[in-house]
Amino acid sequence: MGQKTHPVGFRLGITHTHQSHWFAHQYSKILQEDHAIRQLLRDYVLKAGIARIHILRKSHQIELELHLARPGILVGRSGLGLDNLRTQLQTKWPHLTWRISLVEVSNPDANAVLLAQWLAQQLEKRIAFRRAIRQAMARAQKVGVKGIKIQVSGRLNGAEIARSEWVRHGQIPLQTLRAPINYAIANAYTTYGVIGVKVWINPKH
């Protein structure tokens, strides 16, 4: 029986790079620290649409590169939002110095992470899952992606029995290592329970 492999992990070093760069003896401690940093950032900049968090460590300095759909929301008036974020990080990890740089995502509708987050938000607003999927597919096709696949799993439309449904358009060559498949998962917390969202995107060249 064939097994599915993670599309991003499968392509590390070919079309994708690691999201953290550091070498350390205290591997498990720093890995947990990275996870906590990512969780804090995702909670803080939820409305800004965070697509990627890149962490680079140099001794006691951390360089954060945040890829955002709407960086202006995070920056806020006179950069107050960014200052507050830096203060929160410094308070929680006082032994580290922080450098934060923001990168605007040029094409949010062709980004699997942002599209999965958007779709999860629509499901939380009680929009019918088929309609939400159609809208997400239309947004991606409008910007000219080569292929897209969306799968939702759970108690869809409040059904008693959980199930999975998926829709695909265009080419999604999961076995082709040269294909830079963009993959993301998100959770929609509805009154009926959690609905899982998966998005695969094959961007245009």
Swiss-Prot record:
The keyword Chloroplast applies. PROSITE patterns: KH_TYPE_2, RIBOSOMAL_S3. It holds the Pfam family Ribosomal_S3_C. CDD domains: KH-II_30S_S3. The keyword Acyltransferase does not apply. Residues 37-106 form the KH type-2 domain. One of its GO terms (molecular function) is mRNA binding. GO terms for cellular component: chloroplast; cytosolic small ribosomal subunit. Its main location: plastid. Keywords: Chloroplast, Plastid, Ribonucleoprotein, Ribosomal protein, RNA-binding, rRNA-binding. GO terms for biological process: translation. It is found in: Plastid, Chloroplast. Part of the 30S ribosomal subunit. NCBIfam families: rpsC_bact (TIGR01009). Belongs to the universal ribosomal protein uS3 family. This is Small ribosomal subunit protein uS3c. The lineage of its organism: Eukaryota, Rhodophyta, Bangiophyceae, Cyanidiales, Cyanidiaceae. The gene is rps3.
